[in-house]
Amino acid sequence: MPVSFVTLPVELVYRILDYQSDITIIFSMRNVCQRFNAIVESYDRYQTITTLNLRWYEIRGIGTQHLANVLRNNTTLTTLNLGLNKIGDVGAQHLADVLRTNTTLTALNLFYNQIGDVGAHHLTDVLRTNTILTTLNLDRNEIGAAGAQHIADGLQNNTTLATLNLKRNQIGDVGVQHLADALRTNMALTTLSLGWNGIGNIGALYLADVLRNNTTLTILNLERNRIEDVGVQHLADALRTNTTLMTLNLGLNVIGNVGAHHLADVLRTNTTLTTLNLENNHIEAVGGQHLADALRNNTHTTKLYIVVAHCLEWDVF
């Protein structure tokens, strides 16, 4: 008597699943038929899959659609890595559609996926309605200033996203202005990465204005931008009243001895900042001395990273 797939004993199907990877189970063994869905959902390993790493699988937009269909009924996955998959704006839309109602995913990595401002717009809807997602990585996409505005709109009233990575997205000073406006009302974000975005002194001013009164942001990454001594002065002024920022990364900017002096002045009285990164700027020995003198009286800043110009080594004070 021939054996039909739909009549295979459940235990035999379980044994077949034992030899499949998590990715195969999720992508290829869901939505085959209603009975098989029920069996997969009752399978022990499927019920305990909390992390899925699909980095560099080239799933693109169509693959993201299949994944989104799975996520509609999944109640276990908390961390999803889709880095380097070229999902684009279409893929971002598929994810956004399902994340509006998903109640388990807390961390989403979309690193290097060719997502533009349209895709960022789709993700804005997620930030407005999703109350579970705490970490979003959009590093090395193409959202630009317009996309940053969309993300900022979603952040206005978001109460759960704590970590946002927007490095290498060409958002510039205009994009920073939108994000700074959002930080005036957002009370959830604690970590913001804005490195490699072409941010200059004006962008530093926008951030400084909001940092004066912001009470939630603890980590701010501004590495590899175009911030000069004037921009650092704005940030230093903000640090005189800010009581929450603990880590500030200003490495690979255009900060010289004057900027180092501004930071040294505020380090004498700031009691919150514990880590300051000034690696690979234009700070010479005199600027380094200003910082060293300030730290003699500061018992709170425990890590200062600085490369003195024209020297090969870097020091941690």
Stretches with model-predicted labels:
Residues Y57, N85, N113, N141, ...:
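Conserved "Asn-ladder"/turn position within leucine-rich repeats
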Residues L276-I283, G287-F317:
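Leucine-rich solenoid repeat scaffolds
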Residues M1-V3, V13, N37, G61-N69, ...:
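Leucine-rich repeat
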